[in-house]
Amino acid sequence: MTDIVWHQHSIDQAARGAQKSQNPVLLWFTGLSGAGKSTLAGALERALFDAGFHTYLLDGDNVRHGLCKDLGFSLSDRDENLRRVGEVAKLMVDAGLVVLSAFISPTRAERDRVRALFPEGRFIEVHVSTPLSVCEARDPKGLYVKARSGEIKEFTGISSPYEAPTAAELTIDTSRGDLATQVQAMLAYLTAIEVIDANKLSALA
């Protein structure tokens, strides 16, 4: 038995979203290191922000400077990292925001656990499916070189598995096409499911 109960607010998620002329959701970008998750999420956020939508981007590196700075990279710490991010994202969605997150999140169980925090339609999984060979060739942080040499243990895609989504709402391979086209495809999807109003995008154009 616990004395902790939910405090019901007079203003709900729908009201907060309506005030901002948007339907709040979480877009969860998942994929290998170097796949282009942060680039895609950042470009989409910029397009949404410029059109007048209310957004926030949670990035895998950034949260480790504060929210998760006490965590390492063991399997249990990585799991806790994503648990915290999922809970923070839920609060932000409840606040009426369109939230974007960019995390490798290598297992289906981790991603499904975050999905379970949200009502149907409020969690959008974006699989950034860029092939390992392309990600390794990019290697923007030099992590693949360290993983191949054994300097980094349990590195996703090399010495630790990545479980690709089986039913992602969106799949984007950043080695095909250009960033602007990919952003437009994501905006079209968000418009189709009525997360955002096409009229606001038209006004921006």
UniProtKB/Swiss-Prot annotation:
GO terms for molecular function: adenylylsulfate kinase activity; ATP binding. ATP binds at G31, L32, S33, G34, A35, G36, K37, S38. The active site is at S105 (phosphoserine intermediate). GO terms for biological process: hydrogen sulfide biosynthetic process; sulfate assimilation. Keywords: ATP-binding, Kinase, Nucleotide-binding, Phosphoprotein, Transferase. The keyword Kinase applies. Its EC number is 2.7.1.25. InterPro entries: APS_kinase (IPR002891), P-loop_NTPase (IPR027417). It catalyses: adenosine 5'-phosphosulfate + ATP = 3'-phosphoadenylyl sulfate + ADP + H(+). Pathway: Sulfur metabolism; hydrogen sulfide biosynthesis; sulfite from sulfate: step 2/3. Catalyzes the synthesis of activated sulfate. HAMAP family: Adenylyl_sulf_kinase. NCBIfam families: apsK, PRK03846.1. Belongs to the APS kinase family. This is Adenylyl-sulfate kinase.
